Amino acid sequence: MGIQIKKISNLYLDTKTSFYHALTITLRRDRFLLMSAICVLPVVIPVFVALFSRTVFRESGLDIFIRLSEQIYVHTLTPLLALFIGLIGIREEVDSLTIIYLLTRPVSRLAWVIGRFLAYMLIASFLLAIGILFTFIACVVLGSIHIDSIGIGMMSRYIGVGIMGLLGYGAISFMLGCATNYPIIIGVILFFGWEKAANFIPGIADFWTIQKYLDSMFPVLASQRYNRAVMTVLGSFQKELFFVSPLRAVITISVISAIFIFLAIWFVLWREFTKDRVVGAR
Amino acid sequence: MDAQIETKELSKWFGEVVALNNVSVQIPSGVVGLLGPNGAGKSTFIKLALGLYRPSRGEIRILGKKPRNNFQILSILGYCPEMDHFVEEVSGFEFLYWLARYSGYHPKAAKKRVGDALERVHMVERMYDPISTYSKGMRQRIKVAQSLLHDPQILFLDEPMNGLDPTAREELFHLVIGLGNEGKTVVFSSHVLHEVERVTDTVILIYNGRVLALGKIREIRDLIQNHPRTIVIETMEPKKVYQLLSSDSNITSVNFDTQFLTVHTLDPLQTFKCINEIILEGKIPIFSFHCADEDLQSVFQYLISTHIPRGL
């Protein structure tokens, strides 16, 4: 038998192998380049405002930074990164069926999923952090926000919230990638359909979203910025907000992520990842 | 018999389709051919043995243990799949390197193992080229190489000869025989009888998800020799040939054409003897004769109709 074949699966080594393998796969994908470009794209907005808006009513750098960080980076780009970067490591192996080579080797399924997830977190966090950093610098040019402890603290907090978003959305994406054949479609419906709708539905439906907890971690309270109301011909319905403390929000997202990662591992162990059925099978 | 692989009433179905039905076999060490036409259930059997599928009923054990998600068992199994599943833009070397890492080798050892495996299948020259540039035969070699990477004790080769040129086939035949001689268990799946015959004399006949026979290939050959056949004789005078053959009571029906005589016989050996006599007499020229149904499908049909009890 092989000179260095392990007797039993080594969790650490398997995780490391899966992590580095996922890095090499992800970094050479066109999808990665596309998402890198999208992540730095919001930088042009403050630059555009600085160059072309001359009125006294133009938005300040601080306002633009907050809006871009919250609405573009955290609410839009984190779920996008989770779906498009997160699914490279898992879904491509499943779609191309190269997963059968892995599943017939003594690699821990837990380590394989964790390694892939860590690689996704590293790459997606880096892209998000670079985007927010460049946007921050561009907004500083506009004024009312400075490169000081307050400014850097705010920027760091938004990066932190974004990373928590990547954690939550990423874990759900991984579970979808392992459990379903259409993770991107289901993910888009969940992240951009349900998540947005639930934040307007009166009651506590928003507690079943990641966005609720991310909003709770923002530097400024959500109630101070949003006036969520549904306007209809019968009148406007104001959504009552129930607050969650930032600490509870962090714990909740961590627990949700752990549950979904566990489910992803369970699906890898349970599912039969192979397409070539017998003749006549459906 | 020291059973390396053992199944008990193993069944697998996908929806309403039964891929494998109540299979109970014991596979010994050495090279064993898994012989059956396309869609017979060979790949399903292999995937069950590798733990890629869960049995719908019954069980399969490798060295006495269930294989699914069993790392101890997986570390001694090698698998060359029938289908091409690759990450196209990576090189053959890189593809194998990561699989070696997953098999538990450290980077240096992994590179050495990959080099050795690629040398064994003669792919060293092109090993840094992207897989997308490889021919069908090269891809097949890469698949074989990855299955040998970790020096497995039990190897499953699912239709490994597909797409290989004659030289590569010959090399693979020698490789498989060599592995068998080293004491390894090689399950060699094919739908071509003579391919299996080249590497082993022990076969499992599988058809429609059922194991028809497990035994020596000579016995299968005998069955082929003796089962009813359709023989096509090429001659300028088919009617006269038939008149000469009419003494053979095994012939059940005939068809005439301008140049061909097609006869259906219950005893092909006897009919071949008669044809030989006609040729030796030299009165009527016979240009050629051949069996029109000398394929596995007809053999299996014959085996099912004669050797499988009704109701199975």
Describe the role of every protein-language-model region.
Chain B
Residues 2-7, 12-207, 213:
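ABC transporter nucleotide-binding domains
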Residues 66, 234, 238, 268, ...:
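Short beta->alpha junction loops/turns
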Residues 122, 250-255, 285-290:
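A short linear hydrophobic-aromatic micro-motif
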Residues 267-312:
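C-terminal coupling/interaction segments
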